[in-house]
From Swiss-Prot:
GO terms for molecular function: Hsp90 protein binding. Keywords: Chaperone, Cytoplasm, Developmental protein, Differentiation, Myogenesis, Repeat, TPR repeat. The keyword Signal does not apply. GO terms for biological process: cell differentiation; chaperone-mediated protein folding; lens development in camera-type eye; muscle organ development. It is found in: Cytoplasm, Myofibril, Sarcomere, Z line; Cytoplasm, Myofibril, Sarcomere, A band; Cytoplasm, Perinuclear region; Cytoplasm, Cytosol. Acts as a co-chaperone for HSP90 and is required for proper folding of the myosin motor domain. Plays a role in sarcomere formation during muscle cell assembly. Is necessary for normal early lens development. PROSITE patterns: TPR (PS50005), TPR_REGION (PS50293). InterPro entries: ARM-like (IPR011989), ARM-type_fold (IPR016024), Armadillo (IPR000225), TPR-like_helical_dom_sf (IPR011990), TPR_rpt (IPR019734), UCS_central_dom (IPR024660). One of its GO terms (cellular component) is perinuclear region of cytoplasm. It holds the Pfam family TPR_8. ARM repeats lie at residues 167-206, 209-248, 746-785. TPR repeats lie at residues 4-37, 41-74, 76-108. This is Protein unc-45 homolog B. It comes from Xenopus laevis (African clawed frog).
Length: 927
């Protein structure tokens, strides 16, 4: 059994050596073993000191209190508790403790100074508190007085919002009956006052679980949802932020340390479930405005699906699927042109599609997905009614919405009996609303070639009729997009063109015409971009499109409008124009086999060859595509989906392909825009963006390409490209980029080391591929200046130094030899131990060093002579070995050379080495 006294002594030693963690462990073990009260008090006091050093003030105060319970005049424990309480903001209690200390030791200057300081702080706090209380009262008086002038009320409202965002101010408002007064402001029905009240409540809930819980029960979820339901965009958004802050505080997502407050709050799951239920009810209520419905969908999107799929708890999603999936489907099925439609905004149905998609992706197994599908099937089947056309429209609109979300599920639903037939039948209807819904559904349905073939066979003539005859622009543009999508059903395969030669060009021309027509509403022009997203799979169309600068600029301008739902279509169009989509590798033998077995072999369009793609990239850069992409990256996450990010990343990578173009990309902010794409999104998207960053970082000045602190964010994406699963080009360009960055500062070198890049770089130094091996060695050469890297070479039991020495002997690869010799020169200059180690790692070291010193490449020769000088300077015994070999003759020959400008630096180092040998007495001057 361990001795508690010995444990205490060990703890004291750990404390003196600043190892507070182990000290706490020793004191805690001793406390479990000891029964003597006085000894326990000493241990608690000592442990309190450790917690103070670790800035764990709650625990420090608790331990000091336990020591004081044993001995009320324990001056050390009193002072430690005083320090902890001061840090916790409990100045009045801290003052009492230091007052007691000063009574026990009246002449102690530390106690007297602290007593004076705490007294001043308490007075100041009381003054602020009383002035804050009076200010809060004054503000409410002004706001609730109908006779106050407008300017005064606005100022009071803004001050109240600012106070609510500060913890002290929020607490004063709360303690002064502020919640009830804020409710009175809401009841005035004045939009400005409602906005101020909601924003103040939002600030009060931020990062404070107890206050958030109190506000939930004082105001009520029902009331907050009714505020969010009003037809006022700013009020709906403010109420949404209030609910989000409440949810963050209740779940701990605010990332704040709550301390003792944790113990004051009961289980919050019930409150969170009530919030979710109210939000789902809002989706189908006719009393809720379009803005309110959008915010309810946004809150569900943000808080229900898991952020991290490693977390196995998807109970929130399962609850929403069971209780609210049919409600979400009802929103998806709304037809704005029908009289009984729920209030919507242009984004409501898209937000519902995004939510359906996220919920479906969040399901963990096939039974869960089957339940989801069955609910959808039951809902759609229940909506079909031969006697009620409005119900049929609702069913088709629901399928259309699902196709915009989880496409695989939508495709299964399309296979249900009568769904495709109903779509085609509605296309032939005389009612415009029927045509509108049917055409839009056909557009979303024709993504799969099998579905497109059915529509081409059964419905393409109807679409053409609608396009030619209808006078309704909304239907006309949708019919055009439907034809565009059907025309591109063969993808990039030149042999699978669906329409006659030239038909897709005509469709594209009409899309460009509508796109450039600024008199049309944004929604119609958005559909024109959608059409181009399909048609640009045809190389003739993309060539014509990039030549039309007016159309390009019109599309880029649309990206900058408030309606960001266009982003995916724009990104897809640019992916097609730059050919940055995935192309399967063509194996000649497989092509021959396919032809022999009479299988279809995809054909490449002549204009999809490399030189045509490069011309298109040039045109896009001239049209300021980088500014448009940078603007797209800044869009809200609910609109900028991971798939859109991936598309944008593909475009950036294609634009960075030519080294000559990278300067323009950097100048227009492309480097900065790629960083968020490399950190968030799909694995493919992050890899593409990281590769784009590598291309930029390899040839650009990091200070210009990634100004300020951004350069440190680039390191992680670059290191991710060193993974052995990435292809050789990605490995190579990442190494070049890291070489460039590591040459800038030691802080950057430290960041590269911290991101665990060294094992990967060392691995590539063994690579068979010459260029990758060279790039890895060059990177190591730049990193060798770093302290941690030197320590890795100094450590025993590894062959790192041996590898560097052997790479110095690669005479046929001059650049590799140069990098390896540079690394060795840096290491031997920094560590004398490595000079000695170098002579032990391989018996060939002397021969390799001599070859370096005689090398025809002046840079290699310079490095060889520097290494020799380092060895001579390090140790007399090493110098003796070198003098006894042919190295003395080599140094003498170099040192005796006449002064030549291009070789002077080498000659000078050789002479310094000879002087060192002279000092050792190994050689003598000839008089």
């Amino acid at each position: 059994m361990e001795d508690p006294v010995q444990l205490k002594e060990e703890g004291n030693k750990y404390f003196q050596s600043n190892d507070y963690g182990n000290a706490i462990e020793c004191y805690s073990k001793a406390l479990k073993l000891i029964t003597d009260k006085k000894m326990k008090a000493v241990l608690y006091r000592n442990r309190s000191a450790c917690y103070l050093k670790q800035e764990n003030y709650i625990q420090a105060a608790a331990d000091a209190s336990k020591a004081i319970d044993v001995d009320a005049s324990d001056i050390k424990a009193l002072f430690r508790r005083c320090q902890a309480l001061e840090k916790l903001g409990k100045l009045d209690q801290a003052y009492k403790d230091v007052q007691r200390c000063a009574t026990l030791e009246p002449k102690n200057r530390t106690f007297l100074e602290m007593l004076h300081r705490l007294g001043s702080n308490i007075q100041e706090k009381l003054h602020v508190q009383f002035s804050t209380d009076s200010r809060v009262q004054k503000m409410f008086e002004i706001l609730l007085d109908e006779n106050s002038d407008k300017e005064k009320r606005e100022k009071a409202a803004n001050n109240l919002i600012v106070l609510g965002r500060e913890d002290a101010g929020a607490e004063r408002i709360f303690q002064n009956n502020g919640v009830n007064l804020l409710m009175q402001l809401i009841e005035t029905k004045d939009p400005e006052l409602i906005l101020s009240a909601v924003r103040t409540l939002s600030g009060m809930c931020t990062g404070h679980r107890a206050r958030a819980t109190a506000i939930v029960h004082l105001v009520g979820i029902n009331k907050i949802c009714s505020i969010m339901a009003v037809d006022h965009e700013e009020i709906a958004l403010a109420a949404c932020n209030l609910l989000q802050n409440i949810v963050d505080s209740l779940t701990g997502e605010d990332k704040k340390v709550h301390g003792k407050e944790e113990a004051l709050v009961l289980d919050t799951k019930k409150d969170l479930k009530v919030i979710t239920t109210h939000l789902l009810d809002m989706l189908v209520s006719k009393k809720v405005s379009g803005h309110g419905r959008d915010q309810a969908l946004n809150l569900l999107n943000k808080n229900i699906p898991r952020y991290d799929l490693k977390n196995k708890d998807n109970s929130k999603t399962l609850f929403v699927v069971d209780v609210g999936l049919k409600k979400i489907l009802k929103v998806l099925g709304q037809v704005p042109e029908l009289p009984n439609c729920l209030p919507l905004t242009p984004n409501t149905r898209l937000n519902a599609s995004v939510l359906i998609n996220k919920l479906y992706d969040d399901l963990r197994c096939d039974p869960e997905r089957d339940d989801f599908r069955k609910i959808c099937e039951e809902y759609i089947t229940g909506s079909f009614d031969p006697k009620d056309m409005e119900k049929n429209l609702h069913a088709i609109q629901t399928v259309s919405g699902i196709l915009q979300g989880p496409f695989d599920l939508g495709n299964i639903l399309l296979g249900m009996q009568g769904v495709m037939e109903m779509m085609v039948a509605l296309t032939g209807s005389e009612k415009e609303v029927d045509q509108l819904v049917a055409v839009e559904a056909l557009i979303h349905a024709s993504t799969k070639l099998s579905r497109a073939s059915f529509i081409i066979t059964n419905g393409v003539s109807l679409l053409k009729d609608i396009y030619k005859k209808t006078k309704n622009e909304k239907i006309k543009i949708r019919a055009l997009v439907g034809l565009c999508k059907l025309g591109s059903a063969g993808g990039t395969d030149y042999a699978l063109r669906q329409f006659a030669e030239g038909s897709t060009d005509k469709l594209a021309k009409q899309c460009r015409k509508w796109l450039c027509n600024t008199s049309l509403d944004i929604q119609t022009r958005k559909w024109a971009v959608e059409g181009l997203a399909y048609l640009t799979l045809d190389a003739d169309v993309k060539d014509e499109f990039v030549e039309d600068e007016q159309s390009l600029k019109a599309m880029f301008e649309l990206c900058k409008t408030s309606d960001k739902t266009i982003l995916y279509s724009v990104a897809t169009t640019l992916v097609n124009c730059t050919n940055s989509y995935d192309v399967k590798e063509v194996i000649p033998e497989m092509v021959q086999l396919a032809k022999f077995s009479k299988q279809h072999v995809p054909e490449q369009h002549p204009k999809d060859k490399k030189d045509f793609v490069l011309k298109r990239v040039k045109k896009l850069l001239q049209a300021d595509v980088i500014s448009a992409l940078s603007c797209m990256v800044k869009a809200d996450n609910s609109i900028l989906t991971d798939q859109t990010k991936e598309q944008i990343a593909r475009v950036f990578l294609a634009l960075c392909d030519e080294p000559k173009d990278r300067g323009i990309i950097v100048a227009q902010g492309g480097g900065k825009a790629m960083i968020p794409l490399a950190l968030e999104g799909t694995d493919v998207g992050k890899t593409k963006a990281s590769h784009g960053l590598a291309k930029i970082a390899a040839v650009s000045n990091p200070d210009i390409a990634f100004p300020g602190e951004r350069v440190y964010e680039v390191v992680r994406p670059l290191v991710s490209l060193l993974n052995t699963e990435r292809d050789g080009v990605q490995n190579f360009e990442a190494l070049l980029a890291l070489t460039n960055l590591s040459g800038k500062s030691d802080k950057l070198r430290q960041k590269i080391v911290k991101e665990k890049a060294l094992p990967e770089i060392e691995n590539y130094m063994f690579e068979n591929h010459e260029q990758i091996r060279q790039a890895a060695t060059e990177c190591m050469c730049n990193l060798a200046v770093n302290k941690e890297v030197k320590e890795r070479f100094t450590a025993e039991g590894n062959d790192r130094l041996k590898l560097i020495v052997l790479l110095c002997g690669e005479d046929e690869e001059v650049k590799l030899q140069r990098a390896a010799a540079g690394t060795l020169a840096i290491l031997t200059a920094a560590e004398k131990k490595l000079c000695h180690k170098m002579t032990e790692v391989t018996s060939q070291w002397l021969e390799i060093l001599q070859r370096l010193c005689l090398n025809e490449d002046l840079q290699v020769q310079h490095r060889g002579v520097v290494i020799t000088y380092n060895l001579i300077s390090a140790e007399k015994e090493l110098a003796k070995k070198l003098v006894e070999s042919e190295m003395l003759e080599i140094l003498t020959v170099i040192g005796k050379q006449a002064d030549v400008p291009n070789k002077q630096h080498i000659i000078n180092v050789a002479r310094e080495a000879l002087v060192k040998c002279l000092d050792y007495g190994f050689i003598k001057t000839v008089s």
